[in-house]
Amino acid sequence: GLARAARLGITSVHNMDGDEAQVLRYLALHEAGEMTLRVYVPYSVTPATPLAELQEAAAWRTRFHTSHVRAGAIKLFMDGVLESYTALMVEPYADAPGNCGSALFSTEHFAAIAVEADRLGLQIFVHACGDGAVRRTLDGYAHARRVNGQRDSRHRVEHIEVIHPDDMARFARLGVIASMQPLHAPLTRHSAEVWPARAGQARWPLSFAWQTLRQAGAHLALGSDWPVVTMNPLAGFHAALNREPWRDDDPVQRQTLAQTIAGYTHDAAYAEFQEHEKGQLRTGMLADMVLLSEDIFATPVADIARVHPLLTICHGRIVFAE
């Protein structure tokens, strides 16, 4: 995994495993001088996790804090995915009347977790694909802010495959980060299998709504969700830059090259409170960088996936050279 990431020019990841054994493996690799990237690992929380266990998640913040291995967040699954009707929807699935999917956490249960995690200063990551799951997550974040007061929490919603228009402005208002994955969105409705039918045409305008969220003031961070899709950032670039509206009157959600670069670099660093440390090539920033085979500003967007790294540097050390 590390060697593949280095070949693909990746110098930082957010590993959603949330497993202590995994973090300890990263630490051992770091102490042996073999870590080729930086990793931020949230603590996994399930419906069976006692509220008191969040103290252990908070302890991870100081227990795992090196140049290459960091913690300080929790990760939950609010729902599943649209393909299997397990994503929580506000209205029923277009091709399954009466079925709104399901959630792993009740409104009250998640609100209690959000309040306690926020009180402990933890960042919260929540997998939410359906618009109902996105809403329930935002409701929990809003409740935590009311109880604990406002702070720079940068809680996150992961995926946001569908969003209800009433919830669009809440990301900016609550300071919540939209963590999204360009490769999840079908480039056209014809390149998908069941997803467009599950959502239905009424929800297409706000499906994978990258640009609409940006216009509403949300901070976006872009990533892969590997191993669900390839971890190759340039494949993600291709998806972000070449996406077409599914209907002529749907909003254009494709990203500009500048937005895409920022989403994978500076904005992703912002999503882990590291924007002053990495994510830009500037004096005083960490020496994490990649040399590409072509000038991506001169490469046609249709051909962007052919670009590949020639050199990857992490922490000032060459970790890959072609």
Residue map of PLM features:
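Residue-level recognition of the N-termini of beta-strands and the immediately preceding loop/turn
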Residues: 11, 37-38, 69, 151-155, ...
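Short proline/glycine-enriched turn/loop segments at secondary-structure junctions
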Residues: 62-63, 300-304
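Residues that cap or delimit alpha-helices
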Residues: 106, 299-300
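Metal-coordinating catalytic core of metallo-dependent amide/deamination hydrolases
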Residues: 19-135, 139, 147, 170-183, ...
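Short acidic/polar active-site loop segments enriched in Thr and Asp
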Residues: 3, 11-12
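His/Asp/Glu-enriched, well-ordered alpha-helical/loop segment
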Residues: 115-125, 129-155, 160, 165, ...
